[in-house]
Amino acid sequence: TDPGKVDYSTVASKLNDNNVDYDVFASSYYPFWHGSLDNLKANLNKVATNYNKEVIVAETSYLVTDEDYDGHENYAPKSGQSLPYTSSVQGQVDSVTDIMKTVSEVDSGKGIGVMYWEPAWIGVGNAYNDDGSLNEEKLAANKALWERDGSGWASSYSAAYDPDDAGKWYGGC
């Protein structure tokens, strides 16, 4: 649901009118598409207050670079699109920090979390040769990018807690 275009009270009202049993109301929020953080907070507050629901941002991300690594058009920045933060590691930190702060300020402690998403910002390439066989050199390069730019570093640090998985799936993607 886009908090910039939809009044969440309308959605929550329809769910309520149809006796839909749910615990948490979830929103997507991408700063370059979905309007202001004030609007997001107002929308989440309406659901939390009027329907006594916990709320989350279930999907967000922000770019660390605007370089096109894979030959596919980037979601942002696009012509005419204004970015509220710089395309940098610090811009990503600032974006996520502001979103987390906004959700934490939802009335009555009903803002319970933020989930970060969007591995498409990691510019990995195809790890296969034209004949379909695995190219070990390209795979190693992709793993290095995931280790640096994805959650690979977090998976590596978690090896002591889950040694059977941490080095196998590289963060799950």
Enumerate the language-model features and the residues they cover.
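Noncatalytic carbohydrate-binding groove/subsite architecture in carbohydrate-active enzymes
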Residues: 1-76
